[in-house]
């Protein structure tokens, strides 16, 4: 029996990155041998065991053979005669197919170390094409390692394109698509994930609402990049700089979906694209079973981001309606989420990337004024029921009106 460290732990250590979890492969053993040593079996479809002390995963070396559609349609063979090279051959990328022995020796039959040095993501074998999930995984790795200069090998991108055209991606479950997408949204360069999916044709299959934005023009005065799809990915890139939150990054991705519905004769203008985009966000989130908190913020951003851009021109009653709409009284964190996504939208334009976003400070100050109105004083005035709500609204609106007056006077 021989045990090797494999996969991401080896890859990340070679890149001098933190190793968060370790996976091991066991060659020349049977399930019975591992069970006798105190390992606990957890894999149903293939033999994976938890170490009795470290609880890290140890898998028997195995091969896989395509036996059906999708990423679950595989027959697994695990036995003592399966070699380490056999096991590494079934892996997705060469950089993930490097093993390290107990004495520190690297076993690298598919030249993963060379691809790491050259910053290339390359598939190990043509068996890559049998698992549609790998299209998303490679796009995610491209996003994760983009800051290190990694690119996808042309032959791997070609294979991914063939997979996108084959119809195999339709075998992916919504939960699996969202899980990979959520991981990609957490990377340093989430926009790269969607760009890779577009380049191989998978975006049109899995995210048609986003694909539809490419080729849709916006006024050059406000959008020198012109193309709404390009603007969308630029917005996502800025959002990733502003916040690590998946909710904010996803909302940035979806903020302009409504522009994909604008009739061509109205181009490059997109009046009413905000409310129109809300239905598309709902549709996308239902299809991929995206969590409700992520969906809710994306819908609010789609509807109100343009209003926030003009916040300093809004009447007190409109400001109050905005605060009520985003439910900022019960969910004050929404204010920063809305500001950050709107800022990402404003800066996600060619030549605007480093511009300040004073609307954010204005909105924060307006909220402080409105939120400073005492609910206790309204209740103490003797009002009952809905009259309390109405009086609270009136006082908040009055406070905003007085504050705006002082703001305007100060700027003269």
Curated annotation (Swiss-Prot):
Its cofactor is Mg(2+); Ni(2+). GO terms for biological process: RNA repair; tRNA 3'-terminal CCA addition; tRNA surveillance. Mg(2+) binds at residues 21, 23. Pfam families: HD, PolyA_pol, PolyA_pol_RNAbd. It comes from the Bacteria. The keyword Oxidoreductase does not apply. Its EC number is 2.7.7.72, 3.1.3.-, 3.1.4.-. Magnesium is required for nucleotidyltransferase activity. Nickel for phosphatase activity. SUPFAM superfamilies: Nucleotidyltransferase, Poly A polymerase C-terminal region-like. InterPro entries: CCA_bact, HD/PDEase_dom, HD_domain, NT_sf, PolA_pol_head_dom, PolyA_RNA-bd, tRNA_CCA-adding_enzyme. It catalyses: a tRNA precursor + 2 CTP + ATP = a tRNA with a 3' CCA end + 3 diphosphate; a tRNA with a 3' CCA end + 2 CTP + ATP = a tRNA with a 3' CCACCA end + 3 diphosphate. Keywords: ATP-binding, Hydrolase, Magnesium, Metal-binding, Multifunctional enzyme, Nickel, Nucleotide-binding, Nucleotidyltransferase, RNA repair, RNA-binding, Transferase, tRNA processing. CTP binds at residues 8, 11, 91, 137, 140. PROSITE patterns: HD. ATP binds at residues 8, 11, 91, 137, 140. Residues 228-329 form the HD domain. GO terms for molecular function: ATP binding; CCA tRNA nucleotidyltransferase activity; CCACCA tRNA nucleotidyltransferase activity; cyclic-nucleotide phosphodiesterase activity; magnesium ion binding; phosphatase activity; tRNA binding. The keyword Acyltransferase does not apply. Belongs to the tRNA nucleotidyltransferase/poly(A) polymerase family. Bacterial CCA-adding enzyme type 1 subfamily. A single active site specifically recognizes both ATP and CTP and is responsible for their addition. Comprises two domains: an N-terminal domain containing the nucleotidyltransferase activity and a C-terminal HD domain associated with both phosphodiesterase and phosphatase activities. Catalyzes the addition and repair of the essential 3'-terminal CCA sequence in tRNAs without using a nucleic acid template. Adds these three nucleotides in the order of C, C, and A to the tRNA nucleotide-73, using CTP and ATP as substrates and producing inorganic pyrophosphate. tRNA 3'-terminal CCA addition is required both for tRNA processing and repair. Also involved in tRNA surveillance by mediating tandem CCA addition to generate a CCACCA at the 3' terminus of unstable tRNAs. While stable tRNAs receive only 3'-terminal CCA, unstable tRNAs are marked with CCACCA and rapidly degraded. NCBIfam families: PRK10885.1. Monomer. Can also form homodimers and oligomers. PANTHER family: MULTIFUNCTIONAL CCA PROTEIN. This is Multifunctional CCA protein.
